[in-house]
């Protein structure tokens, strides 16, 4: 819904074998606000507030699971989940989330300013968080002047940040699953001016370009696009265009890889949705399956290899077509290697990022251990050892940050509203601001 009027719990779900898995949470939605549900949690049961019993949904079709989860506003849904932090499927917990509408203002673009100080010099880094590419099509069709849209909001926020004399801008597209293609084009022209934003190839092989040759650029200063694995579709179009035009840095992880266009046709007894075309960057590469690779990689608190279009059975492959004409802003130059070096130096000094690296290495080791003992006592001992290792890694970081440690693994896994939560996403944003400050210092002075 481009108008961002959603009802339910605000979670994107997918089918993962027998399980319904949480792919991502809608910014500002009931699930995110509850702090009880996370990406990669598996939903194994659903119940209603007045029911004592939880319905087992293992092996169910995803649309049937969604039907159980949805319900009237202000009612409670119970979810039995296997937490993403759990080592196996034997540990579950039941959470309650109150269904609600996702308010437009919760999903609208927001601004902030981060201050980065280097050798006595302060860099004011503007941040615009954009959770979705939204547009009120009804108001647009009525030709209302001030209809709600992401591009209009971002323009206003940029002008406001300019008045506050920012030195550079971060456009935060993390967890932005896309939305209006029209808005992706409009936003691209804010940073690129006129030109092609994306190419579209139909099933019959014809290719056409989307963009605006007369687009008006309103921001021409240092720019960084922040993405993660849940940045998809329109987010990938915008990030890919900025990267191809060499207008700014793209920082984060590989994106989702959703580069196809679907169409819904009405049938006599229902509807059918089918893929009719694919997106291609101006440089010729498809965003399908592969996504957009950042100029500088940042660590991720989740296993990014287990998420994305490439994990779907029968997903269309990545391919290339001929590149189209586009302007080279040449804003990056040879600075990327220096910026990467400075970034890696900071990583070695950060408790949070060192801990993320250690946890990733530990999980890789766990995944590579394919031997399972048939002796029940040995299996229990191995499980307890793994739980203690993960708990030790978590508590090690909490001690370094001066936070209370968890007494046992059960307390760690079942935590819900931790008042001393370690905000990894905020640490990633702060490091992005440091990268942009480096970019300004070495490229724009």
Model regions and ranges:
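Conserved functional hotspot residues or short segments at active or partner-binding sites
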Residues: 287-444
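Cleft-lining beta-strand/loop regions that shape enzyme active-site pockets
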Residues: 2-6, 12-33, 38, 44-268, ...
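Short, compositionally biased low-complexity segments
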Residues: 36-44, 162, 401-413
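Acidic, polar loop-rich interaction surfaces within structured domains
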Residues: 229-232, 240, 247-250, 254-323, ...
């Amino acid at each position: 819904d481009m108008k961002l009027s959603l009802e339910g719990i605000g979670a994107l779900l997918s089918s993962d074998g027998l399980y319904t898995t949480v792919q991502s949470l809608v910014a500002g939605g009931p699930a995110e606000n509850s702090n009880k549900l996370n990406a990669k949690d598996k939903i194994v049961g659903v119940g209603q507030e007045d029911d004592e019993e939880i319905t087992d949904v293992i092996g169910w079709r995803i649309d049937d699971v969604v039907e159980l989860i949805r319900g009237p506003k202000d009612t409670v849904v119970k979810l039995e989940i296997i937490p993403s932090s759990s080592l196996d499927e034997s540990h579950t917990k039941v959470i309650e989330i109150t269904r609600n509408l996702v308010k437009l203002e919760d999903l609208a673009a927001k601004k902030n300013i981060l201050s980065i100080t280097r050798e006595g010099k302060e860099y004011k880094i503007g941040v615009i968080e954009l959770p979705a590419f939204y547009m009120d099509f009804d108001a647009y069709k009525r030709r209302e002047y001030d209809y709600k849209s992401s591009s209009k909001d971002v323009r206003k926020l940029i002008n406001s940040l300019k008045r506050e004399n920012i030195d550079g801008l971060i456009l935060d597209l993390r967890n932005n699953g896309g939305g209006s293609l029209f808005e992706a084009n409009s936003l691209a022209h804010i940073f690129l001016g006129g030109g092609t934003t994306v190419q579209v190839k139909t099933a019959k092989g014809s290719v056409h370009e989307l963009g605006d040759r007369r687009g008006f650029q309103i921001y021409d200063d240092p720019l960084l696009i922040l993405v993660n694995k849940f940045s998809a579709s329109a987010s990938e179009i915008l990030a890919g265009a900025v990267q191809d035009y060499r207008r700014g840095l793209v920082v984060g992880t590989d994106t989702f890889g959703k580069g196809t266009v679907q169409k819904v046709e009405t049938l006599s007894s229902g509807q059918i949705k089918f893929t009719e075309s694919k997106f291609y960057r101006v440089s010729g590469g498809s965003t399908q399956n592969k996504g957009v690779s950042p100029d500088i990689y940042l660590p991720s608190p989740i296993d990014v290899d287990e998420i994305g279009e490439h994990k779907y059975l029968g997903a269309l492959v990545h391919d290339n077509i001929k590149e189209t004409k586009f302007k080279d802003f040449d804003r990056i130059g040879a600075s990327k290697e220096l910026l990467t070096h400075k970034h890696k130096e900071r990583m070695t000094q950060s408790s949070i990022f060192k801990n993320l690296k250690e946890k990733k290495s530990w999980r890789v080791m766990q995944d590579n251990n394919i031997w399972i003992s048939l002796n029940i006592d040995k299996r229990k001992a191995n499980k307890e050892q793994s739980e203690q290792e993960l708990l030790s890694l978590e508590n090690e970081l909490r001690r370094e940050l001066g936070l209370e440690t968890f007494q046992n693994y059960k307390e760690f896994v079942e935590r819900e509203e931790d008042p001393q939560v370690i905000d990894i996403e905020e640490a990633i944003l702060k490091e992005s601001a440091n990268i942009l400050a480096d970019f300004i210092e070495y490229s724009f002075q």
